[in-house]
């Protein structure tokens, strides 16, 4: 069994405010390519474990859910850092969160209490590190966002254990965007 923590930028950090933004398709394609490469190595159970943030985490789950028909060994888990996560979000985002919660194979709160302190977020990070074998980050250290905290704790954890990290930076995203645009042009020509 393999377990990967998928995380990265929030949608607003990438200036993405609509689900149909072409950047979402590019990011999901990057995520699918990574997952396919991992899944094609063997038929062992493979878990995508992530959090509830709008952005990379949700897109990671959506990408995994789209691949499940072709890869029955692929499982999805959504972990909230604390109870009632997202209750302050607008209704549309709450509906999206509820929807993805109902589609995953496993869902739980790391802390059963509503938000009380930053310690719950640190506990969440520790939980994710100790319950996964590697991390996939959509993150560029030159353009820090909230993912900086996950990146730093993963770097530190890697020094103490056999934990690996794959991260996709903006240069790699740009390459994929150009390839995606070319594929779209080819489709339009036919």
Curated annotation (Swiss-Prot):
NCBIfam families: PRK13660.1 (NF010181). PANTHER family: UPF0398 PROTEIN SPR0331 (PTHR38440:SF1), UPF0398 PROTEIN YPSA (PTHR38440). InterPro entries: YspA (IPR010697). Belongs to the UPF0398 family. It comes from Limosilactobacillus reuteri (strain DSM 20016) (Lactobacillus reuteri). This is UPF0398 protein Lreu_0922. It holds the Pfam family YpsA.
